[in-house]
């Protein structure tokens, strides 16, 4: 959530920043809400002052032996008016908060203008796509030929956009996960975390999925309001909800491996073949909690950690700076990493790394205690390090051989019992 003071006092600056997203707020509406809020707050405070003065007057009259019944009757009426004014003020503040929760984060000044992915800016490329001297297969054909990737079985078990991995491919996915976690925890300084795969609505409000994106979530039926996590970002970032952290503890850095569950609402007909777009997929997520002045440098570091995984695996990729119109709801700046997929002859997203600024922290009331003993909002960051299923398909396609076997990248061989290939 963006700073309410900006909405109250500088809506023009908010709209100027949101223009990069193609979003504009109605200044008249927000001015009207602020006028009503001030009127109700002033009325409430005035009535409270009148009640306090009346109580003092009653005490003086009774002390003098006089009759204070008339004033006491008026005070009772004032009490009823105060209750009504407080209810009206609370309802208005709830309305303002709900409207504020639907406003996306303000893009950083360095974010380019643009409407969609066509306006994103390529920052760099790493690696050279392999030139094959045989007719290549996509990962779906490779997996089915090996007998280790089954979509029909998953459809029978659950439905479309699910998959079953068996044998060497299942082991390769586990190897990728272990390699990612080992790299982030042993080399990059993250603390490993395993978290619940079900979260409550407060957690999803904290990270920004609710209330705006409920249709993208899987919600459980029953008495308790639980949702399947769309990413480990949700539970891990909420570690600091309603907390005040000592400054010397920052930054906090966590890495978590979880399945992720997404309804993929609005993606009907897109990427229906293979592992690109699934309702359930594994991901290793990185989360950092930092001081405000450190967050932009932390974004570069976190993105570099995701790049390091791709480089260690020898997978060609490119780094993209997202334009305002393509950024996620809660982000102030985002880099996407796109891996080369030979069968599609293009790059596809494999990691998204975002600085959320204080947007999530304000929703969560996540603060830290400064050296001056004041409390300020932390900044939060998150990034995929990496999406495991998409990394698996990238390894399968980029490391395939003419005989259908798949070479095992050197860094994964210790996790594969020394195997140099699988078939």
Curated annotation (Swiss-Prot):
Identify the InterPro entries for this entry. Answer: aa-tRNA-synt_IIb (IPR002314), aa-tRNA-synth_II (IPR006195), aa-tRNA-synth_II/BPL/LPL (IPR045864), Ser-tRNA-ligase_type_1 (IPR002317), Ser-tRNA-synth_1_N (IPR015866), SerRS_1_N_sf (IPR042103), SerRS_core (IPR033729), tRNA-bd_arm (IPR010978)
What highest taxon heads this organism's lineage?
Bacteria
Q: Which GO terms describe its cellular component?
A: cytoplasm
- Give one Pfam family: Seryl_tRNA_N
**Function, as annotated:** Catalyzes the attachment of serine to tRNA(Ser). Is also able to aminoacylate tRNA(Sec) with serine, to form the misacylated tRNA L-seryl-tRNA(Sec), which will be further converted into selenocysteinyl-tRNA(Sec).
Q: What is known of its domains?
A: Consists of two distinct domains, a catalytic core and a N-terminal extension that is involved in tRNA binding.
UniProt name for this protein = Serine--tRNA ligase
**Per the UniProt entry, what species is this protein from, by scientific name?**
Acinetobacter baylyi (strain ATCC 33305 / BD413 / ADP1)
